[in-house]
Amino acid sequence: MKICVLGAGSIGGHVAVLLAESGHAVTVIARGTHLAAIRRSGLKLILDDGSEHTAPDMAATDDIRLAGPQDLVILAVKANQVEALVDDLPTLFHPETVLLPMQNGIPWWYFQRHGGALEGHCVRTVDPQARIMNAIAPQRIIGCVVYPAAAIIAPGVVRHIEGNRYPLGELDGATTERITRIADAFTAAGFKSPILPDIRAEIWLKLWGNLTFNPVSALTHSTLVDICQHPLTRDLASRMMAEAQAIANRLGIEFRVTIDKRIAGAEKVGKHKTSMLQDIEAGREPEIDALVGSVIELGRLTGVATPHIDTVYALVKLLKQTVAAENLCLRALTKDVMEGAMRATLPGGQSVVS
């Protein structure tokens, strides 16, 4: 297949390298020093077993419009980055192109091909103006849940931390020729990609962890095992999960594991920093609304109260605002320091910083 991976970051890099290695024609969309490194030396993946895999001739660009029509488009950017891509996405489509979104949280397409009274409902927290929903035909979409953990450790280099599960599901639950073909391609590349009859149930199972551990870790600067072993934060996680479970149940979703088992699974991961904590520490915009705000929205929609989720959401939104303000001040301070240093050394004290 011709495959385009939008966002060659940690997860995008993980799938791009192994799909290319298994014989598919893969193009990645990347930016900055990461793109420059991929163009120069290819995209390198270090798996959790220490083995190294490199796609030396990986096609890479920062312009979606140059990639051309694809058989499969893997959307491996954060939920809050999708809307900015919708104008250019159609340049990647031919009539049979499949779009495989890999976002965490409640996706924009959740109620598309859903059936029932909520068919076509727009999740405004993740798609405020319904631009994404209106731009992408739901018939193109196959759902996917991302379980692996990975990180970019240097430009052009992705380290896989753990996991290889990418469950797939048609939005209407059907087992089609196209989803079988994609699942087979993922399996041949070394991933575990079962075809699920209800991908939304799997989304909620993954979201249980993202909803709770991500914001709590960002607020406390703690790892998964820290949160799970501290009695108060473990109890908070349990209460947030119970609220989410009540919402999902109202939407017809049943969980195949208990809350205690889900927390125990997170505890076993150990000293792992969640992506939200990593974003906060790196000064990047954290992914909050798709993971937390969307659940509150669905709580309002279904009539389920979410007091614990509401409180954590308010705190982490303020944290985001505070970090953004601090980063702005830091950038201004850095510029002032640089200008002062340059004035001290240049004739006439003129500034060379713009």
Region spans (language model):
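NAD(P)+-binding Rossmann beta1-loop-alpha1 motif at the extreme N-terminus of oxidoreductases
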Residues: M1-D48, V352
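Rossmann-like NAD(P)(H) cofactor-binding subdomain of soluble oxidoreductases
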Residues: H53-P56, T61-I153
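Internal alpha-helical scaffold of NAD(P)-dependent oxidoreductase catalytic cores
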Residues: L92, M133-K206, T212, A218-R256
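NAD(P)-dependent Rossmann-like dehydrogenase/reductase catalytic/cofactor-binding core
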Residues: D226, R234-S354
